[in-house]
């Protein structure tokens, strides 16, 4: 994994080169004079061309860290699924500030335990009826997974379907059930043969409930991504027990045109395929408690090595159009002296103590340096270059502790 302090360098230098006027949140007080001097020296046309090339290089470095081929340019029609926002809040600990009614899902511990990347996909709008052995309607829909990188190993996948209750006067109806079956299309329908499908998951659910249902479709998606088998889509079949044919399939929301209420909510209620994968870099997603600020006791000499505040605001560098959350984060940085003799609170190594001792008698040997000794990860929710929503864990992004090394 590329060290987190490299990303901080990229962000800081991009801010300088962009020539923004508001550095309050991004540049610490002690660094503003140097930034102003750099900007003052940047008046020539030659500097403008050089800074443009540097900016492109820095942005390329950042995009490589994110695993992106190019800078995302989100379309106005891009939709952020509520599920992904809730998953981000649960994963980052923000649900502690929200009521249980606002976040109505449980964190998928099992799926996330082997993944550092979560991706969401909406199905393509074109739907197709697929004949089956029963009279229950079977609808085929396709998810385009071509944006999943080759180096990302998919470990589990879930299909989320929204179903609404259908009001009926019969008491027997309210006590009834219906079954939802999910199939993988192994061979599509053709003029010469019927479609061949295999059952992936099934669920018996109560009629009189409105909620999201989750189905395990891992075998199909792993075949498509890892084994490079053809993706012919999925089929949904809804069978209502002891129900008239006119009501078959009315519960599950898979099409914009279905005669259901809340038509304007289609963007949030349409089927959603969620993949959990790992790109081989960093640790898996883990549900974290909300990070509380560390309070360091007052030190006699504030010039010594310690942690300083550094808030990275993505809007300052123009990346807030594709980074959904967080809007920024407290990255911190390490700065200060490592004087002889090194005190215990400076978190030094034996080598740093020896180096500082030698420096006290031979100034040609440099002092120990104030550097991060503990770094933590952050989670980011963003739109990639294909307008797909991604939740990813990035290591070594926040300084938790400093020391002389």
Swiss-Prot record:
GO terms for molecular function: cytokine activity; growth factor activity. GO terms for biological process: beak formation; beak morphogenesis; cartilage development; embryonic skeletal system morphogenesis; intermediate mesodermal cell differentiation; negative regulation of DNA-templated transcription; nephric duct formation; ossification. Glycans are attached at residues 144, 208, 347, 362. Keywords: Chondrogenesis, Cleavage on pair of basic residues, Cytokine, Developmental protein, Differentiation, Disulfide bond, Glycoprotein, Growth factor, Osteogenesis, Secreted, Signal. It is found in: Secreted. Residues 20-291 form a propeptide. One of its GO terms (cellular component) is extracellular space. The keyword Hydrolase does not apply. InterPro entries: BMP4_TGF_beta-like, Cystine-knot_cytokine, TGF-b_C, TGF-b_propeptide, TGF-beta-rel, TGFb_CS. Residues 1-19 form the signal peptide. Disulfide bonds join 305-370, 334-402, 338-404. It comes from the Eukaryota. Homodimer; disulfide-linked. Part of a complex consisting of TWSG1 and CHRD. Forms a ternary complex with chordin/CHRD and TSKU. Negatively regulates the structure and function of the limb apical ectodermal ridge. PANTHER family: BONE MORPHOGENETIC PROTEIN 4, TGF-BETA FAMILY. Belongs to the TGF-beta family. This is Bone morphogenetic protein 4. The gene is BMP4.
């Amino acid at each position: 994994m590329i060290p987190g302090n490299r990303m901080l360098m990229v962000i800081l230098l991009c801010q300088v080169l962009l020539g923004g006027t508001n550095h309050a949140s991004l540049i610490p007080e002690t660094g503003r004079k140097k930034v102003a001097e750099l900007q003052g020296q940047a008046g020539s046309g030659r500097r403008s061309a050089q800074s443009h090339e540097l900016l492109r290089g820095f942005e390329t470095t950042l995009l490589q860290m994110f695993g992106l081929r190019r800078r995302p340019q989100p379309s106005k029609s891009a939709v952020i699924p509520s599920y992904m926002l809730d998953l981000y809040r649960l994963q980052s600990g923000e649900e502690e500030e929200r009521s249980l009614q606002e976040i109505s899902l449980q964190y998928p511990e099992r799926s996330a335990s082997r993944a550092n990347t979560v991706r969401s996909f909406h199905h393509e709008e074109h739907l197709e009826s697929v004949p089956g052995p029963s009279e229950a309607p079977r609808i085929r829909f396709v998810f385009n997974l071509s944006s999943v990188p080759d180096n990302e190993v998919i470990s589990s996948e879930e299909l989320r379907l929204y179903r609404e209750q259908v009001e009926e006067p019969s008491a027997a109806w309210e006590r009834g059930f219906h079954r939802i079956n999910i199939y993988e299309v192994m061979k599509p329908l053709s003029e010469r043969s019927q479609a061949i499908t295999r059952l992936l998951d099934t669920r018996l659910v109560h009629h009189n409930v409105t909620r999201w249902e989750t189905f395990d479709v891992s075998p199909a998606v792993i075949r498509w991504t890892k084994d490079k088998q053809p993706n012919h889509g999925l089929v949904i079949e809804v069978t209502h027990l002891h129900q008239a044919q006119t009501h078959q399939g009315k519960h599950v929301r898979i099409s914009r045109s279905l005669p259901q209420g809340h038509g304007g909510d289609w963007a949030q209620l349409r089927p959603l395929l969620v993949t959990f994968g790992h790109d081989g870099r960093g640790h898996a997603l883990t549900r974290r408690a909300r990070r509380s600020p560390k309070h360091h006791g007052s030190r006699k000499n504030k010039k010594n090595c310690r942690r300083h505040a550094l808030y990275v605001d993505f809007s300052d560098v123009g990346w807030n159009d594709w980074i959904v959350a967080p809007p920024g984060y407290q990255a911190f940085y390490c700065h200060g002296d490592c004087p002889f003799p090194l005190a215990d609170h400076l978190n030094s190594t034996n080598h740093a103590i020896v180096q500082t001792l030698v420096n006290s008698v031979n100034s040609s040997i440099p002092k120990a340096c104030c550097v991060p000794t503990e770094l933590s990860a952050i989670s980011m929710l963003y739109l990639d270059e294909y307008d797909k929503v991604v939740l990813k864990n990035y290591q070594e992004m926040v300084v938790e502790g400093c020391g002389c090394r």
